[in-house]
C-alpha cells in the first residue's frame, strides 16, 4: 500500500483552511487540518474534516445518468450523453435562439476557478440573450450593485481589517459559524478574540444572540431594521460634526446630499423601527468616529432584507463618514497588483455598468448583475410564453428547488422544459427532474486557485493546489463538461466558433486554451508573480504548488491609501449621490407590514450545515439532527407553546411545520429558521432524505414586485409570519 500526505486546502467556505489529505493507493481516506498553513495554522471545522465522506459517499453520482421512460435513471456513457445533449441543445437553439437556454450556477461553483472561467466563456459564446441565474440573488448580488454605485465597479469590495481594528461592529453576520463571508480570514473567531485581548471591542448587532454574539457584546435589533440604524448613525455623525469633512471631500462627492437624506432619521425617529435606544445609537456613532481603528461589517442579514442594496450602500457610507474607509484597522480594499490593474478594472466597470443599465430580464425588468438575472424569476421565465422563454436549463453545483423563493413553483415549472441537464455530486431535489445528470469532480479531484477571494483577504495570501486524487468513477471536472458541450456546438453557434478558432490558433503554438492557462497568467502578473520571467523566483501556478504547498503570505496587511486607485469613476472619488438610493430611502419610509402576521422571520446558520448540500455526511448528521424554529420564551408562553411542540409558521406566501426550540437568545417577536432543509425523498441522497425538515423558502415570495429592485434579491429576512401550535 502506498500512503501519501498531500497539502491542499478546503473550498467549502471562504477561509480556505489548509488541509492535509491522506491518500492510500489513490483513494482519499482522511482529511486533517494543516498545522503548517501560515494562516489557518492547524484549524479546520467539522465540515472540512467530514468531506472525506462526501468524496467516498455511496450515494454520490460517479457515472453519467439518463432518465428512463419510467422516471428513474440509468447509467449511460459520457459520449452517448454528450452527443444527445448537444444535438437537442443545438436543435432548440436553432429553433428559438440563445434566449431559450438557461443556466443556474450554485454557490460551490464560485470555489472552482475553472468552473467560473469556463462558464464565463460559454456565456460569451452564446451571447447576451442566454439566461444566467446564480445563487448570488439569494446571497450577495446587492453587494455588487452597491459597489458599482459607489466605486464604479461591482468588484470593488471593502473588507474589515480584522487583524488591526480596535472596534469591530458586526451586523447581520455570524462569523463564528460562517467563518466569514465576503471576507477571507482563517481562524476568524480567534482573530476577533485578539481584538478584545488588545483592549478593543467586538459588537454584534443581530435579532438573535448568535454564536458570535454569545462570545462578544450583543445588541438586539428588529429584523430588517439595519437601514434605519445606519441612517440614524449617519444622522448623528453629521449632526454632531463627527465627520472629517476635508477627508470626506477628498474621498467622495455627494456628501452634502447624503447628509440631507439622513437628516430625518434621528435615533428617536428610528427607535420604533430598530428597537434600539437612541442613547445607544448616539454612543455607537461617537465610538465609531472616536476610535482610531474601527470597522462596520455586514453580510447575509444585511443583504437579504427588503432594501438590501441600500443597506449595503449605507454600511460603506457609515465607514466613510466615520473616517474608517481605506484606513488601517478600518474597512480596506484588496488588489491583485498586476500592471494596469486600474485601467483593466475601469474598462470592466464601464462594461458592467452599461450592461446593468441596458439589459433587463424578460420577467420583472430587473437589471443584469454581473451578467445574471434574479433566480427568483427563474420559474416564470420557464413558464411564461414568448420570445426568450427558457426551454433548456442546465444546473451546475446548485439545488435551486431548495434555495430560491417558492421552490414548489420552480419544481412544477421544471416539468415543462424540453431539456434539463445537471452537473453535480448528487441527484438532489432539483436534479431529480433532469434528463441527464453528469457526475462532477469534487474539490479534491481537481487543481484549484481561489480566484474570487484574492481581494477579500486582510492578509494577502496565495495558495494553489493540484488534484489530490483522480476523479472517482467517471466523474469529470465541470469545466471539461462545459468545454465538451462548447466543442460539439461550435459549428452551429457563431460565438462558440470564435472560441474554437482561438483554441486552434493557440494549439499551433503548443498552447492549450484552458482555465488554468488564464489563472496562471493572473498569478504571474499579480503581486509576487514572476511577470513571465521578468521577476526571478516569482510565483506561477506550478511554483505555488511545488515550492509553497502550504501557501505563502505576500504581505502582513493590506495597503491603505488605495481608494483613488480602486474607484474607477473619472475624478477617482466615490459617488454617493444616486437617484436609485434616494428612491430606496423613500421606499424605506413607506414600509408597511401585512395584517395578521405579527412576527418576523429571520434565517440562521448551523455549524454542521452548508446550505443544502452537506446533509448526507454521517459525521455532520450524527445525533439524529432535527431542524427547529427558534422562538422567544415570552412569545411561546403567550401562544401556549412549549419546547418541542410542533408549530405552523405561515406567511402570506406559504406555510411550513417544524418543532420549536424555546430560547431567550432572540428578540421577542422574532423567529429563526435555518435554511437548506426540506429534503423530501425525491433526491438520491438517503441520509439527507431521512433528515427531512422543511424548506423555509416556501415562506418567501417569488413575485417580481416582492424582489429587491436594484439587485433582484429575494427577501429572506424580516419576513412577516404567524406562528401557531399544531394540534396533536
Where are these predicted regions, by residue range?
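N-terminal export/assembly segments and adjacent metallocofactor-ligating motifs
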Residues: 1-240, 254, 277, 368, ...
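Flexible, glycine/charged-enriched surface loops at secondary-structure junctions
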Residues: 96-100, 243-248, 295, 326-333, ...
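Short glycine-rich or small-residue beta-strand-to-loop segments that form or flank ligand, phosphate
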Residues: 101-107, 170-172, 295-305, 394-396
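Extended redox/cofactor-interaction regions of prokaryotic respiratory oxidoreductases
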Residues: 116-193, 198-205, 212, 227-231, ...
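Active-site phosphate/pyrophosphate-binding segments
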Residues: 233, 251-375
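C-terminal, active-site-flanking charged/polar segments
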Residues: 416-419, 423-448, 453-461, 486, ...
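Long, contiguous, secondary-structure-rich segments that constitute the structural scaffold
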Residues: 467-468, 472-532, 536, 612-630, ...
